[in-house]
Amino acid sequence: MEFPTKYVYITSNLDKPKEWFTQSEMSLTTTTDTIQKSFVNNSGSSSSSKGFGEAVLLDILDTAGQEEYSAMRDQYVRTGDCFMIVFSIDSRSSFEEVSQLKQHIERVKDRDDVPIIIVGNKVDLESRRQVSRIEADQLARSLRVPYIETSAKTRSNIEEAFFTLVRHTPRNTVYKVVVMGGGGVGKSAIIIQFIQNHFVEEYDPTIEDSYRKQVTISGLPPIGGSLNKKSSSSSSSSSSSSGKTGLFNKIFSGKDKQPSPQQAASPSTIDRTGQISTNRLEANVLSYSMSNLSKEVPLITGDCVYCQGCNVILSRFSNLVKTGDDSFTWKCEFCKYSNSNILLEQGEIPNKDSVEYVLSSPSTSSTTDGSKREESIIIYCIDVSGSMGITTEVPSLQSEWVNAKKGVKGASSGPSYISRLECVQSSIPTMIDRLSIQYPNKRVVLVTFSDEVMIYTQSNSVDGPIVIAGDKLEDFDQLIEIGRSMTYDKLPTASGSSDFLKAKIKSLEPVQSTALGPALLVSAAIASQKMLSEVVICTDGVPNVGLGAIEDLPLGPAQEFYEKVTKLAQNNKTTINIIGISGSHIDLGVIGKVSEQTNGNITIIHPLELAREIRKLTQNPMIATDVEMSICLHPTLEINKYDSKQGLSRVVKQFPNVNSLTDLTLLYSSRNRPTEFVQIYPFQIQIKYTKLDGVRCLRVVSAQLQATPDFNTSTSNANISILAMAFTQQAAKIAQQQEYMESRLHLKAATKLIRSLCNTDEQWEEFYNFEVLREEMEAPLITCIKNKQQRVEKAATDDEIQVFYKMKNVHKSFVEGGRKKDISRRKGEAEINKQYYNIKFT
């Protein structure tokens, strides 16, 4: 359990202080307006500043992999300010890519003066050197860019590489740095060493990430100055294209116009100009990461002791009064009920904030965590309707890179196209190869759907697939029966059916309609045979055949059908993931709830990103099932109405399964008329869950915070990442209630509060991360507000729904400063990395 500060802000004011915004700030004609035209310049308050240099923020993209398409990389390359091209001194092939990469960058940017530095990495492997220092220097001089040699392992020249690049870049307060290079050259290692002073031998090359770090660099010209006449001109062009007049400068410009955090936060100095208001936000936020369930905590013998008055559990903060040899009285810190004659031995008294009780042992047939994951089932449920034959233009960035690799110079030969189904056909075989290495015994099933549903397994390779058509598509019970007839022992393993499945996928062709509902039900029935199984649906259209059909039909029957499918999946701990194709419509407002309520992922992506998205699903496995979480606050506090019914101090949340990226937050406040004054506020979270080995446990997490009526005290030294995550999730919850204007106001107020609290480098980094998320929500919210005003039938389309879903489930890695990021998830395995590097993308 985490809190942004050490305090609970208590106020008895019936009228909460307001934040005011002008009509201009709330304009629906732009998505780049922020709360104030001028933001604080943090260069004077950098915690890393030692009296020299300028504080700047580096926004660094780690371009995972090689040529695989990524919308994130596309955006960064187009809007990047400067580029680091990395090769490995023990790999001549990676060195030979340097010139191609530089040409590629210049063609995309349409400039020949892009700030670039060449980095020769792995100088700790001098004995294996294939590229001499002289040869690399000569190439750098011929390309008119600086060259530096580094070792991510020993941290040699790591900072200097980034600082040199920034010094060669037109002056700004935020720099988008793009790190590029061939596979295995150490791009990730360089970035992590720079951010966290840490080295990991093997990184998973498929995980793309961005990092923010505020640093102090000497030798920078003043803002508005230029390196030379030519770069000054290019700087103007770059700033315009990257949106610097929007988000970035607005965060960090206006040096002397912003009051101190204490002044900004004080109720007496709140700006009351404006026509639109919302309640001022507070730092009364609670957060809990489900990743903690995979961490060991002290095991308490015996049964837990419940308060007879409110069902809170005895904790280390409870005041036990000894009344006999092993007898105690406990006056509950929550409800003040006096619990008497409590019999406890010393080992039964909790002595840590987090403790655990075993509720039941696993059955003798239970297996280990790893084997349960490996023995589970994954069903790829693929849309092969006619619309999957629609072609999409390959983004010019991707085409440019392919041409660069081929050594093609000059103008592109013209746009190239790829169908949605072809993207699927190139994505899933790669994933099957990966599963064959990671989980060779995992069962893999291919289900396709058009106007009929087909089930492919190796056992039916002779007779052909099982075909479901006609009236069967309307029969719920028969569809379940067909799915469960595919018994577990008949299902092929990833390693044993790799060639068969890849051949079938390659032979798929688009035909006719979209029987998504029946295909989903059959897939869920197959998956129900093993806990921790998952279904991956890839579709581009609204269901229009069989059960669950939506197109041109009443929604009631379809909603009822998908609710039944959801219950089936929940009962069997199955996760359902939905991947939609951008530019299509699948009605996530109805279908998406199946994924949301089974803790799956909902994603709308470019067809070329299918491989990346499908792979990501296996990189975040479940860690617990049957989770019931009770959050208990003191009776004088109440939970925000979007997290519980109005006015409650306790809320219970249930999850069929959770993973390590499930981070929960809630907002709370003091009641308008508190019944008592409390100096120390207790908090407790009770989590009943089942481990992957079958053990049923109860984890009790307790905490205490000091009360304060002073707003400034309550926000001092705030953990910005917790506030950012909580406010982002809250805005998404509000938007999902179709209160789009209130959601936008909430984000505006959050920006105002968080910005006023920033002092340290880490706080500024995390504020920047929050602003990136806020900007991502801004356009969808404006679209929904306009649609609602115009009385459009569906104010939120699939694109907006997907953004709100993503933001509701945003986790710490999105908002934490670079130094706090958990890089353990970046560790890779040599065999898997080799398999990925051998893939050739087109």
From Swiss-Prot:
Entry keyword set: GTP-binding, Nucleotide-binding
Keyword Plastid set for record: no
InterPro entries the UniProt entry points to: P-loop_NTPase, Small_GTP-bd, Small_GTPase, Small_GTPase_Ras-type, VWF_A, vWFA_dom_sf, Znf_Sec23_Sec24_sf
Biased composition (Polar residues): 259-274
Sequence positions that bind GTP: 62-66, 121-124, 181-188
Cellular-component GO terms for this entry: COPII vesicle coat; plasma membrane
Organism domain of life: Eukaryota
Disordered: annotated span: 253-274
GO BP, one annotated term: intracellular protein transport
Domain VWFA residue range list: 377-627
Annotated Pfam families: Ras
One GO MF term: zinc ion binding
Domain comment as written in the entry: In contrast to other GTP-binding proteins, it is characterized by a circular permutation of the GTPase motifs described by a G4-G3-G1 pattern.
PANTHER family found in the cross-reference section: RAS, DI-RAS, AND RHEB FAMILY MEMBERS OF SMALL GTPASE SUPERFAMILY
Family the UniProt entry places it in: Belongs to the small GTPase superfamily. CpRas family.
Listed name of the protein: Circularly permutated Ras protein 1
